[in-house]
Amino acid sequence: MTHAIRFHKTGGPEVLVWEEVNVGKPGAGEARIRHTAVGLNFVDIYNRSGVYPLPLPSGLGGEGAGVVEEVGSGVTDLKPGDRVAYGAAPLGAYAEARLIPADRLLKLPDSIDDKTAAAMMLKGLTVQYLIRQTYRVKAGDTILLHAAAGGVGLILSQWARHLGATVIGTVGNDEKAALAKANGCAHVIVYSREDFVKRVDEITGGKKVPVVYDSVGKDTFLKSLDCLAPLGVAALFGASSGNVEPLNLGLLAQKGSLYVTRPTLNTYAAKAESLRAMAKELFEVVTSGAVKIDVRQTYALKDAAKAHADLAARKTTGSTVLLV
Protein backbone atom coordinates (compact mmCIF):
# COMPACT_ATOMS: atom_id res chain seq x y z
CA MET A 1 0.00 0.00 0.00
CA THR A 2 1.06 3.56 -0.64
CA HIS A 3 -0.11 6.83 0.87
CA ALA A 4 -1.86 9.87 -0.56
CA ILE A 5 -3.39 13.14 0.59
CA ARG A 6 -7.16 13.01 0.11
CA PHE A 7 -10.21 14.91 1.30
CA HIS A 8 -13.69 13.57 2.05
CA LYS A 9 -15.38 16.97 2.44
CA THR A 10 -14.59 20.47 1.26
CA GLY A 11 -13.24 23.09 3.63
CA GLY A 12 -10.01 24.51 5.01
CA PRO A 13 -6.59 22.84 5.10
CA GLU A 14 -7.76 20.66 7.99
CA VAL A 15 -9.87 18.51 5.62
CA LEU A 16 -6.71 17.10 4.02
CA VAL A 17 -5.90 13.63 5.35
CA TRP A 18 -2.91 11.31 4.83
CA GLU A 19 -4.26 7.84 4.15
CA GLU A 20 -3.41 4.50 2.61
CA VAL A 21 -4.49 3.94 -0.99
CA ASN A 22 -4.30 1.02 -3.38
CA VAL A 23 -2.81 2.22 -6.65
CA GLY A 24 -3.10 -0.98 -8.67
CA LYS A 25 -1.64 -1.82 -12.06
CA PRO A 26 -1.78 0.46 -15.09
CA GLY A 27 -4.49 -0.17 -17.65
CA ALA A 28 -4.26 0.31 -21.39
CA GLY A 29 -2.63 3.64 -22.22
CA GLU A 30 -1.65 4.28 -18.60
CA ALA A 31 1.57 4.39 -16.60
CA ARG A 32 2.24 3.97 -12.92
CA ILE A 33 4.69 6.51 -11.56
CA ARG A 34 6.42 6.88 -8.22
CA HIS A 35 6.54 10.55 -7.28
CA THR A 36 9.66 12.20 -5.97
CA ALA A 37 8.27 15.75 -5.85
CA VAL A 38 4.85 17.39 -6.24
CA GLY A 39 4.01 21.00 -7.10
CA LEU A 40 1.74 23.19 -4.98
CA ASN A 41 -0.61 25.55 -6.83
CA PHE A 42 -3.42 27.92 -5.88
CA VAL A 43 -5.86 25.86 -7.92
CA ASP A 44 -5.35 23.12 -5.31
CA ILE A 45 -6.99 25.43 -2.77
CA TYR A 46 -9.91 26.08 -5.14
CA ASN A 47 -10.41 22.32 -5.47
CA ARG A 48 -10.07 21.59 -1.76
CA SER A 49 -12.43 24.39 -0.69
CA GLY A 50 -15.14 23.58 -3.22
CA VAL A 51 -14.75 26.64 -5.44
CA TYR A 52 -14.19 24.09 -8.20
CA PRO A 53 -16.46 21.22 -7.07
CA LEU A 54 -15.17 17.65 -7.32
CA PRO A 55 -16.75 14.25 -6.66
CA LEU A 56 -15.78 13.23 -3.13
CA PRO A 57 -13.66 11.71 -1.75
CA SER A 58 -10.97 13.11 -4.01
CA GLY A 59 -7.25 13.30 -4.48
CA LEU A 60 -5.54 16.60 -5.20
CA GLY A 61 -2.78 18.13 -7.28
CA GLY A 62 -2.09 18.36 -10.99
CA GLU A 63 1.70 18.72 -11.12
CA GLY A 64 4.46 16.30 -10.22
CA ALA A 65 7.70 14.57 -11.14
CA GLY A 66 8.99 11.07 -10.59
CA VAL A 67 9.93 7.76 -12.15
CA VAL A 68 7.91 5.36 -14.28
CA GLU A 69 7.40 2.05 -12.45
CA GLU A 70 5.22 0.20 -14.95
CA VAL A 71 3.34 0.85 -18.20
CA GLY A 72 0.10 -0.58 -19.51
CA SER A 73 -0.63 -2.08 -22.90
CA GLY A 74 -0.25 0.20 -25.88
CA VAL A 75 2.32 2.47 -24.23
CA THR A 76 5.40 2.43 -26.43
CA ASP A 77 7.22 5.69 -25.73
CA LEU A 78 7.77 5.17 -21.99
CA LYS A 79 9.49 2.43 -20.02
CA PRO A 80 10.18 1.66 -16.35
CA GLY A 81 12.95 3.88 -15.02
CA ASP A 82 12.17 6.88 -17.21
CA ARG A 83 12.25 10.23 -15.42
CA VAL A 84 9.01 12.06 -16.16
CA ALA A 85 6.95 15.05 -15.11
CA TYR A 86 3.49 16.42 -15.82
CA GLY A 87 1.43 19.54 -15.35
CA ALA A 88 -1.69 18.95 -17.42
CA ALA A 89 -3.21 15.77 -16.05
CA PRO A 90 -6.11 14.47 -13.96
CA LEU A 91 -5.90 15.30 -10.26
CA GLY A 92 -4.00 12.95 -8.00
CA ALA A 93 -0.45 14.26 -7.68
CA TYR A 94 -0.56 14.42 -3.87
CA ALA A 95 0.43 10.77 -3.63
CA GLU A 96 3.49 8.57 -3.25
CA ALA A 97 2.48 6.78 -6.45
CA ARG A 98 -0.36 7.01 -8.96
CA LEU A 99 -1.77 5.87 -12.28
CA ILE A 100 -1.86 8.46 -15.05
CA PRO A 101 -2.63 8.57 -18.78
CA ALA A 102 0.74 8.02 -20.44
CA ASP A 103 0.18 10.76 -23.01
CA ARG A 104 0.17 13.32 -20.19
CA LEU A 105 3.72 12.42 -19.13
CA LEU A 106 6.75 14.27 -20.45
CA LYS A 107 10.26 12.84 -20.36
CA LEU A 108 12.61 15.09 -18.43
CA PRO A 109 15.94 16.21 -19.86
CA ASP A 110 18.95 15.43 -17.68
CA SER A 111 19.48 19.15 -17.14
CA ILE A 112 16.26 19.52 -15.11
CA ASP A 113 16.08 17.87 -11.67
CA ASP A 114 12.88 16.46 -10.18
CA LYS A 115 12.28 19.25 -7.65
CA THR A 116 12.62 21.89 -10.35
CA ALA A 117 10.34 19.94 -12.67
CA ALA A 118 7.64 19.58 -10.03
CA ALA A 119 7.75 23.32 -9.47
CA MET A 120 7.61 24.34 -13.11
CA MET A 121 5.30 22.08 -15.07
CA LEU A 122 1.82 23.45 -14.40
CA LYS A 123 3.09 26.98 -13.85
CA GLY A 124 5.50 26.92 -16.78
CA LEU A 125 2.98 25.42 -19.19
CA THR A 126 0.50 28.06 -18.01
CA VAL A 127 3.01 30.78 -18.84
CA GLN A 128 3.66 29.21 -22.25
CA TYR A 129 0.04 29.42 -23.32
CA LEU A 130 -0.43 32.88 -21.79
CA ILE A 131 2.50 34.62 -23.49
CA ARG A 132 2.90 32.46 -26.60
CA GLN A 133 -0.74 31.77 -27.48
CA THR A 134 -3.41 33.73 -25.56
CA TYR A 135 -1.54 36.94 -26.37
CA ARG A 136 1.74 36.45 -28.19
CA VAL A 137 4.20 38.70 -26.37
CA LYS A 138 6.76 40.30 -28.67
CA ALA A 139 9.83 42.48 -28.36
CA GLY A 140 8.90 46.05 -27.55
CA ASP A 141 5.67 45.20 -25.72
CA THR A 142 5.00 46.64 -22.27
CA ILE A 143 2.76 44.26 -20.33
CA LEU A 144 1.04 44.25 -16.93
CA LEU A 145 1.32 41.23 -14.65
CA HIS A 146 -0.50 40.88 -11.34
CA ALA A 147 0.92 38.68 -8.54
CA ALA A 148 4.36 39.11 -10.06
CA ALA A 149 6.12 37.42 -7.12
CA GLY A 150 4.05 34.24 -7.29
CA GLY A 151 5.05 30.98 -8.94
CA VAL A 152 3.52 31.83 -12.32
CA GLY A 153 4.55 35.46 -12.02
CA LEU A 154 8.26 34.79 -11.57
CA ILE A 155 8.34 32.51 -14.60
CA LEU A 156 6.22 34.82 -16.77
CA SER A 157 8.26 37.92 -16.02
CA GLN A 158 11.55 36.18 -16.85
CA TRP A 159 10.23 34.61 -20.04
CA ALA A 160 8.62 37.86 -21.22
CA ARG A 161 11.87 39.74 -20.57
CA HIS A 162 13.69 37.08 -22.60
CA LEU A 163 11.28 37.82 -25.47
CA GLY A 164 12.16 41.51 -25.30
CA ALA A 165 9.12 42.81 -23.43
CA THR A 166 9.01 45.29 -20.56
CA VAL A 167 7.12 43.86 -17.59
CA ILE A 168 5.16 45.96 -15.09
CA GLY A 169 4.41 43.78 -12.06
CA THR A 170 2.11 44.29 -9.09
CA VAL A 171 2.86 42.82 -5.66
CA GLY A 172 1.62 43.12 -2.09
CA ASN A 173 4.71 44.21 -0.15
CA ASP A 174 8.31 45.39 -0.41
CA GLU A 175 9.83 41.93 0.01
CA LYS A 176 7.82 40.66 -2.94
CA ALA A 177 8.69 43.81 -4.88
CA ALA A 178 12.40 43.04 -4.55
CA LEU A 179 11.81 39.47 -5.67
CA ALA A 180 9.79 40.54 -8.71
CA LYS A 181 12.42 43.12 -9.65
CA ALA A 182 15.14 40.47 -9.48
CA ASN A 183 13.18 38.16 -11.76
CA GLY A 184 12.42 40.28 -14.78
CA CYS A 185 10.05 43.07 -13.79
CA ALA A 186 11.31 46.43 -15.04
CA HIS A 187 8.72 48.25 -12.93
CA VAL A 188 7.08 47.02 -9.72
CA ILE A 189 3.93 48.48 -8.15
CA VAL A 190 3.10 47.75 -4.50
CA TYR A 191 -0.69 47.76 -4.81
CA SER A 192 -1.26 48.17 -1.05
CA ARG A 193 -0.01 51.75 -1.24
CA GLU A 194 -0.06 52.68 -4.94
CA ASP A 195 -2.85 53.02 -7.50
CA PHE A 196 -1.73 50.61 -10.19
CA VAL A 197 -3.94 52.20 -12.88
CA LYS A 198 -2.31 55.58 -12.32
CA ARG A 199 1.18 54.07 -12.21
CA VAL A 200 0.68 52.11 -15.43
CA ASP A 201 -0.49 55.30 -17.12
CA GLU A 202 2.63 57.11 -15.87
CA ILE A 203 5.03 54.32 -16.85
CA THR A 204 3.61 54.00 -20.36
CA GLY A 205 3.25 57.73 -20.97
CA GLY A 206 -0.50 57.32 -21.33
CA LYS A 207 -0.25 54.59 -23.98
CA LYS A 208 -1.34 51.84 -21.57
CA VAL A 209 -0.64 48.14 -22.26
CA PRO A 210 -1.78 45.61 -24.89
CA VAL A 211 -2.32 42.82 -22.35
CA VAL A 212 -2.95 42.30 -18.65
CA TYR A 213 -2.28 38.90 -17.08
CA ASP A 214 -4.54 38.68 -14.04
CA SER A 215 -4.71 35.74 -11.62
CA VAL A 216 -6.07 37.84 -8.74
CA GLY A 217 -9.60 38.34 -10.06
CA LYS A 218 -12.19 40.23 -8.03
CA ASP A 219 -9.86 42.81 -6.47
CA THR A 220 -8.05 43.76 -9.68
CA PHE A 221 -10.10 42.88 -12.74
CA LEU A 222 -12.14 46.03 -13.39
CA LYS A 223 -9.13 48.25 -12.75
CA SER A 224 -7.10 46.01 -15.04
CA LEU A 225 -9.44 46.98 -17.89
CA ASP A 226 -8.52 50.62 -17.27
CA CYS A 227 -4.88 49.74 -17.94
CA LEU A 228 -5.52 48.37 -21.43
CA ALA A 229 -4.90 50.18 -24.69
CA PRO A 230 -7.65 49.98 -27.33
CA LEU A 231 -8.10 46.39 -28.58
CA GLY A 232 -6.18 45.18 -25.54
CA VAL A 233 -6.53 41.71 -24.01
CA ALA A 234 -7.45 40.98 -20.40
CA ALA A 235 -6.30 37.41 -19.70
CA LEU A 236 -7.94 36.28 -16.46
CA PHE A 237 -6.35 32.97 -15.44
CA GLY A 238 -7.13 32.81 -11.72
CA ALA A 239 -9.15 34.32 -8.91
CA SER A 240 -7.05 34.35 -5.74
CA SER A 241 -9.14 37.23 -4.32
CA GLY A 242 -12.48 35.76 -5.42
CA ASN A 243 -14.47 35.42 -8.62
CA VAL A 244 -15.06 38.45 -10.82
CA GLU A 245 -18.56 39.90 -10.56
CA PRO A 246 -20.85 39.54 -13.62
CA LEU A 247 -19.77 42.06 -16.24
CA ASN A 248 -21.80 44.23 -18.62
CA LEU A 249 -20.07 43.52 -21.93
CA GLY A 250 -20.89 47.03 -23.07
CA LEU A 251 -18.11 48.14 -20.74
CA LEU A 252 -15.58 46.54 -23.09
CA ALA A 253 -16.80 48.78 -25.91
CA GLN A 254 -16.61 51.89 -23.75
CA LYS A 255 -13.03 51.13 -22.73
CA GLY A 256 -11.72 50.61 -26.27
CA SER A 257 -13.14 47.45 -27.89
CA LEU A 258 -11.33 45.26 -25.38
CA TYR A 259 -11.05 41.49 -25.37
CA VAL A 260 -11.54 39.37 -22.24
CA THR A 261 -10.61 35.70 -22.04
CA ARG A 262 -10.62 33.08 -19.28
CA PRO A 263 -8.09 30.56 -20.62
CA THR A 264 -7.18 27.23 -19.04
CA LEU A 265 -4.23 24.90 -19.47
CA ASN A 266 -6.51 21.92 -20.07
CA THR A 267 -7.88 23.57 -23.21
CA TYR A 268 -4.52 24.52 -24.68
CA ALA A 269 -2.89 21.18 -23.80
CA ALA A 270 -5.84 18.92 -24.63
CA LYS A 271 -4.03 17.25 -27.54
CA ALA A 272 -0.87 15.30 -26.77
CA GLU A 273 1.02 16.94 -29.63
CA SER A 274 0.10 20.41 -28.32
CA LEU A 275 1.27 19.46 -24.83
CA ARG A 276 4.60 18.18 -26.14
CA ALA A 277 5.18 21.33 -28.22
CA MET A 278 4.43 23.54 -25.22
CA ALA A 279 6.74 21.51 -22.98
CA LYS A 280 9.53 21.66 -25.57
CA GLU A 281 9.49 25.47 -25.42
CA LEU A 282 9.40 25.42 -21.62
CA PHE A 283 12.30 22.98 -21.33
CA GLU A 284 14.34 25.08 -23.78
CA VAL A 285 14.00 28.37 -21.89
CA VAL A 286 14.75 26.69 -18.56
CA THR A 287 17.72 24.69 -19.85
CA SER A 288 19.17 27.79 -21.54
CA GLY A 289 19.04 29.70 -18.25
CA ALA A 290 16.70 32.37 -19.63
CA VAL A 291 14.14 31.27 -17.02
CA LYS A 292 15.24 30.12 -13.58
CA ILE A 293 12.80 28.18 -11.41
CA ASP A 294 12.98 29.42 -7.85
CA VAL A 295 11.82 26.78 -5.36
CA ARG A 296 11.54 28.91 -2.24
CA GLN A 297 9.60 26.57 0.07
CA THR A 298 9.50 22.80 0.54
CA TYR A 299 7.26 20.67 2.75
CA ALA A 300 6.86 16.95 3.24
CA LEU A 301 3.90 15.68 1.21
CA LYS A 302 2.18 14.49 4.39
CA ASP A 303 2.32 18.12 5.63
CA ALA A 304 0.28 19.43 2.68
CA ALA A 305 -2.25 21.05 5.05
CA LYS A 306 0.48 23.33 6.44
CA ALA A 307 1.58 24.21 2.91
CA HIS A 308 -2.01 25.09 1.97
CA ALA A 309 -2.40 27.31 5.02
CA ASP A 310 0.80 29.21 4.23
CA LEU A 311 -0.11 29.65 0.56
CA ALA A 312 -3.58 30.97 1.41
CA ALA A 313 -2.08 33.39 3.95
CA ARG A 314 0.28 34.73 1.25
CA LYS A 315 3.29 33.65 3.31
CA THR A 316 4.92 32.01 0.30
CA THR A 317 6.77 33.45 -2.68
CA GLY A 318 7.80 31.79 -5.92
CA SER A 319 7.29 28.05 -6.17
CA THR A 320 6.55 25.54 -3.42
CA VAL A 321 7.25 21.82 -3.67
CA LEU A 322 5.95 18.91 -1.61
CA LEU A 323 8.69 16.29 -1.25
CA VAL A 324 7.80 12.60 -1.29
Predicted regions and their residues:
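Short glycine-centered segments of the SAM/dcSAM-binding site in methyltransferase folds
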Residues: R83, T142, T166, G232-V233, ...
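Glycine-rich phosphate-binding loop and adjacent beta-alpha segment
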Residues: V171, D219-A290, V324
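Hydrophobic/small residue at the entry helix of a nucleotide-binding pocket
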Residues: V152
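Glycine-rich beta-strand-centered segment in the early N-terminal region that forms part
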Residues: N22-G39, S49-G92
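C-terminal hydrophobic helical "lid"/dimerization subdomain
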Residues: A272-V324
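NAD(P)H dinucleotide-binding glycine-rich loop of Rossmann-like/cofactor-binding domains
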Residues: Y46, Y86-A149, W159
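Adenosine-nucleotide cofactor-binding segment
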Residues: R161-T220, K271-E273
